[in-house]
A protein has these predicted regions:
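Hydrophobic packing within well-folded, soluble alpha/beta domains
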Residues: 32, 41-44, 49, 127
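Short loop/turn segments that connect beta-strands within beta-propeller blades
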Residues: 1-2, 45-48, 86-91, 131-135, ...
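Short loop/turn microsegments at loop-to-beta-strand junctions
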Residues: 39-40, 125-126, 157
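Extracytoplasmic beta-rich repeat domains
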Residues: 4-28, 53-69, 91-114, 140-156
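Conserved beta-propeller blade signature
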Residues: 32-34, 72-75, 117-120, 128, ...
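Hydrophilic extracytoplasmic domains
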Residues: 122, 133-174
Length: 174
């Protein structure tokens, strides 16, 4: 327990523009999930650092989140869609797709699953929230014209948001 390195992982790309430089890993049951600009969703064994699977079906880029119960990993694609995958050690393929129509997207912020909804921001200053079980859009609110950082869902009806332009907003969502 001294902070010693256990393992390192990379996707094999020497180009930092394609490496997982801005991803925030999610984990469940000994598996780490990441999405890098190479547009693969990758599952890594948390004990060994070995790649378990890589999936490029939906071209997820850097933005992921995990369900409250850990059973589902969510990814934001570069065009309009949120995709979901079951968390497991073999490639599950896409569980579902939800077209939210947000357009071209590249903000590396997390999708936050809390209080039965998943909430995230986009490069155009719009915050979205969807029901991961339906799946369907619950609400969307434009707060600015710049990139939205990872949101802070405070309660089932209150979300705190900041943008790259320095705008801080508290949203009442119900």
């Amino acid at each position: 327990k001294d902070g010693a390195l256990i393992w390192k992982w990379n996707n094999g790309s020497p180009n930092r523009m394609l490496s997982p430089a801005m991803c925030t890993p999610a984990a469940h049951n000994g598996i780490v999930y990441i999405a890098a600009p190479d547009r693969y969703l990758t599952a890594i064994d948390a004990g060994t650092g070995a790649t378990l699977w890589r999936n490029k079906e939906a071209t997820v880029r850097e933005s992921t989140g995990i369900s409250e119960d850990g059973s589902t990993i969510f990814g934001k694609t570069m065009n309009d869609e949120i995709v979901a995958y079951k968390t497991q050690s073999t490639d599950p393929g896409i569980l579902w797709r939800l077209n939210l129509g947000f357009g071209y997207e590249h903000v590396p912020s997390m999708l936050i699953a809390k209080f039965g909804q998943v909430t995230f921001g986009t490069k155009n200053g719009v915050v979205y929230s969807f029901d991961p079980l339906a799946p369907k859009l619950l609400w969307a609110h434009k707060i600015d014209n710049s990139m939205v950082n990872t949101v802070n869902v405070l309660s089932d009806d209150t979300t705190l948001v900041a943008t790259m332009d320095g705008v801080v907003t508290l949203l009442k969502t119900r």
